[in-house]
Structures are given as structure tokens and as C-alpha cells.
């Protein structure tokens, strides 16, 4: 994996790119950090879409929280 400092820098750059109005497709296992910078997302479980919606809706979805936030 990447060092925490490098991950932090990558997310910072992704936010800056998106702030310019450029759409970013991000595939990432760190759901909490990814949803914090996302507008909309898809959550996969065993290769299938288990949920989709706004970042806020996904972060409050009980199934997503159970699977990805412990």
C-alpha cells in the first residue's frame, strides 16, 4: 500500500482537480476517506453493486456502514 502521507497528498490533488469542474472516477477501498470527497458513488460487494447514491446517503446507509465502516 501507499504511505499515509502519499495517500493524503493524492486525495488532496483529486479534490483540487474536481474543484476545477473535472469529473474524477476513483476506485478505492478506503470508503470513509473516499466518501468524504465524493459527490456520488457506487459500493461494490463481491463484484456486485450493493448500493449507489450520494456520498451522504451512502455514508448513512446501514448496509454500507456495516460492510465498510465496521
What are these regions (language model features)?
Residues 7-20:
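Helical segment within the ABC ATPase nucleotide-binding domain
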Residues 28-29:
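H-loop/switch region of ABC-family ATPase nucleotide-binding domains
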Residues 40, 52:
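Short, glycine/charged-rich "phosphate-handling" switch motifs in NTP-dependent
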Residues 3:
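ABC-family nucleotide-binding domains
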Residues 34-36:
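A short, surface-exposed alpha-helical micro-motif characterized by mixed small hydrophobic
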Residues 56-59:
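Short acidic-hydrophobic catalytic motif
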Amino acid at each position: 500500500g501507499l504511505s499515509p502521507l502519499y495517500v493524503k497528498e493524492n486525495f488532496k490533488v483529486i479534490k483540487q482537480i474536481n474543484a476545477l469542474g473535472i469529473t474524477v472516477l476513483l476506485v478505492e477501498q478506503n470508503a470513509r476517506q473516499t466518501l468524504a470527497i465524493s459527490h456520488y458513488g457506487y459500493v461494490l460487494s463481491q463484484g456486485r453493486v450493493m448500493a449507489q447514491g450520494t456520498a451522504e446517503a451512502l455514508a448513512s446507509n446501514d448496509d454500507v456502514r456495516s460492510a465498510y465502516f465496521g
